[in-house]
Amino acid sequence: MLASACTHSWRTGRFLNRIIKSSVQTLTAAALIANLSACSRPTTLEKIEQEGALHVITRNAPTTYYEDRDGPAGFEYELAKKFSEYLGVELRLRVANDLDEAYTVLEQNYTNLAAVGLSRLAASAQSPSLRFSSEYLEIQPLVLYRNGSAKPKQLDDLIGGKLIIPAQTAQAEFLRQVKDSRLPDMDWLEAADMETSEIMRLIEEGEYEYAIVNSREYEIHKAMFPRAREAFSLMEPLQISWIFPPGEDMSLIQKADEFIKQIKDDGTLIYLQERYFGHVNQLNYVGARTYISHIKDRLPKFEPTFKQAAEKFEVDWRLLASIGYQESHWRPYATSPTGVRGLMMLTLPTAKEMNVKNRLNPEQSIFGGAGYFSRIKQRISERITEPDRTWMALAAYNVGLGHLEDARALAKAQGLDQDKWIDVKQALPLLQQKKWYVKTRYGYARGWEPVHYVQNIRRYYDVLVWMTQPSAEDGSVAQNEDAPTTGADGTTEETPAIPAPFRVTPPML
C-alpha cells in the first residue's frame, strides 16, 4: 500500500514537472515573440520617415495659419514647415474647424502633432493623456473692455458685466477655479465657435462689456477693433507647446525638442517672431480708427490703380497701398514743407526719374511710386531673401539706398547679420550718432525714421491682408492630407477617414 502510494506520488510529480516545464517554455516563447514584435515595430519617427510626410493639424487664425496671396502663411505654419524640413519629409497640413475637432483628431491618433497655439495648461484640461513638446512661445492672457466705459482694474470689477471668453482655454480653466474659490457670482460666456477676431468685434460693437483673449492675438487684431482696449493681465504668462497624441512613443517628441532647441540657439525662432509679431504695436487707438475709416472711405477710389501698378511692377497691391497710406493717408493733393507732393509723396527728382509729369495726378503718382520702389528693390543684394528683401527695400525707399548700405555695414561690424532686417533695423539708428556715422560712406541720416517707416507699413499691410483675404477654395493646402500616401515599399494606401469634414476657412473679421 505504501509502495503504491509512493509510485503514484512519483508519477504525479513527473506529470507536474512536465506541465511546469511546458508552461515555462510557452511563457518564454511568448516573451521572445513579444520582444521580437516590439523590436520589429517601427517608432513614430521611423513611420514618418518611411511615409515621407509629417501630419500636422492646425487652426485658421492670424497667429497660427492662414492663406495669403502667395499661399500658406502664419507663425505655426512656418514653424511646422521648418520642422518637416528638419526631418527631411513633406508637411501635410489639416485645418480644424474648431478646437474640439483638433482634440478629436489628436485623441484618435489621426495626426502626428497639433500646432494650434495653445498652452499645456489649456490642452491638459481637455485631455490629460495628451503629451507636449518643450515651450517655444509665451502669451499673456488679457482682460479687455470697451473704450469709453469704466476701465476695470481687477476681476471683482467684472462681476455683473457681460463677459465673453474663448472656450477650451487656460483662461476658462482659471476663471472656474476663481469662481469656486472666491468669486461665486462671477459669470461668463464661453464661445466655442469664435476666434479672437469675432470676440473683439463683439467688444467693439458694445454687445459685450468684457472679454479675455491672449496677448499675441490681441496685438494682431487691435488695429481692426480699436475700441477693444486692454484693462489688465488675468494671470501669469502661459507657455505655448506643440501637442502630441497619447499612446505613441517618445521618438517624435524628442526630435521636436531637439528642433526647438536648435531654432532657439541659431536665432530662427527670434526671426519668425519678428516676422509675424515684431511690428504689431505700431498703431495707436486714434491711428487705428482713422485707418479703418480710410480703408472704407478713401481706398476704393484708388484700389484699381494700385492693382494695375502692382501687376505691372510685380508687387503686392496691398503693399503699394500701404506705402501710399504711410506717405499721404491716400490724399492725392498732399504737399509737405520739403516739397514732396502727391499720393505717393514723390520728390521732384524722383518724379523726373520715373517720368511723372504731374505729381498731383493720383494715377501718375501711384505708377511712379510703384516703379521707383520696384527699381530700388531690384538693386537690393540678391542674396537677401524675402521678406527681409522687401523690408530693406522699404527702408531704402525712405532713407536712400546708400544709407541702408551704411547700416548693413555697421550691422556686420557689430557681429550682426547684415542680410536680416531684424539686425539691420538695430544698426540704422546709429547713423544719427557721430561716432558711428563718421565711419560710413554716406554720413549722417535720421536712422529712426526708416525703422518706424517700415514698421508702420508692415502694420498697415497686415490689416489690409486680413481685410482682403480671399476665401480658400478647393485644392487648398489642407486637401493634400486626403491624398493617397506612398509607403517605403512603393505601395499606396488611403489615409484613414476623418470623423468630421475639414476645410480651410477665412477668419471672421
Curated annotation (Swiss-Prot):
This protein's UniProt keywords: Cell outer membrane, Cell wall biogenesis/degradation, Lyase, Membrane, Signal
Active site (UniProt): 327
Region (Disordered): 474-500
Residue ranges, annotated region (Non-LT domain): 41-280
Reaction(s) this enzyme catalyzes, per UniProt: Exolytic cleavage of the (1->4)-beta-glycosidic linkage between N-acetylmuramic acid (MurNAc) and N-acetylglucosamine (GlcNAc) residues in peptidoglycan, from either the reducing or the non-reducing ends of the peptidoglycan chains, with concomitant formation of a 1,6-anhydrobond in the MurNAc residue
Pfam families: SBP_bac_3, SLT
InterPro entries (UniProt xref): Lysozyme-like_dom_sf, MltF, Solute-binding_3/MltF_N, Transglyc_AS, Transglycosylase_SLT_dom_1
A GO molecular-function annotation: peptidoglycan lytic transglycosylase activity
GO terms under cellular component: cell outer membrane
CDD domains reported for this sequence: MLTF-like, PBP2_YfhD_N
Keyword Membrane: yes
Entry text on domains: The N-terminal domain does not have lytic activity and probably modulates enzymatic activity. The C-terminal domain is the catalytic active domain.
Annotated function: Murein-degrading enzyme that degrades murein glycan strands and insoluble, high-molecular weight murein sacculi, with the concomitant formation of a 1,6-anhydromuramoyl product. Lytic transglycosylases (LTs) play an integral role in the metabolism of the peptidoglycan (PG) sacculus. Their lytic action creates space within the PG sacculus to allow for its expansion as well as for the insertion of various structures such as secretion systems and flagella.
Name of protein: Membrane-bound lytic murein transglycosylase F
